[in-house]
Amino acid sequence: MSFDERYGDGLMLAVTFGGGGLFFVAWQIAYLSELAASGVEIGGAQRVVGTSAGSLVAAVTTSGRLRRIQTELAAVARVPAVLALLAPSKDLHPSQLRALGLFHEADGAAPDTVRAIGHASLAACTPSAARLRRSTAIVTGRGKLSDPALRITAVDAFTAERCVLGAAAGTTLAAATAASSAVPGLFAPQPIGDRRLMDGGVSGTGVHLDLVAGARRALVLSLSDGTEPGPGMMTTAPGSFLVERSALEATGTEVFARSPEPVEVTELMAPAAVPKALAMGARQARADAAELRAFWR
């Protein structure tokens, strides 16, 4: 990742939506919906970056489906059994557990580490790639990835290269978000062109802030603010978010970053935790609305 490229030069407003499972999808949807109700519309950003769970949020934000998805999510949240259909199975094969274990235990994103995770993901006995695309299409619709502002991140499961999908990729929103959300071991890597792509967070970052470097202002929604103590995990090294944010600010970009209140890792893919995520996101948005209204001017 290089901030020297200044991919956001010339942009006034940018936003990046980070990964964090079903919980963070719900939190971000509620946060953005509450901001919109307070007169803060994020849809006008000239660069919208989505990674993993955040790719779904980026897709619905740029396609004008935010309010509809928020209403539907709030309704099904009352019935956790319905949400459970969108979560991965708890009965995992040994090959799935191997890939998932490598991902969870990785405290950095050295190329050899990411390749090992990717190869294990390719070898895992997961549900079909098409099944994940059908699930993401419920959220994104079946349209093309065509918005010029949108960038969806993923990782080549064989080479460990980062791939940034935009309108030129010639794919659908459902396929791009499925690729970005294909957690190693839980979901199959997704075919995009001649590649098999996995979760964009298997890259040492959940927000890819270099893609907005040089923009005048950037809103960053991240699962973590980088201040929590403890070892690295899921290819993210301790303190890496703070390093990434500092590098972005060094390009001249003014940053407003927000994370949810602390949550347990076990809640991230738990359907029963979605009502908590919705309430938390709305509450934090109300607290931030005045400050963000001035920032997002």
Sequence positions of predicted segments:
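Patatin-like phospholipase
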Residues: M1-T51, L56-R297
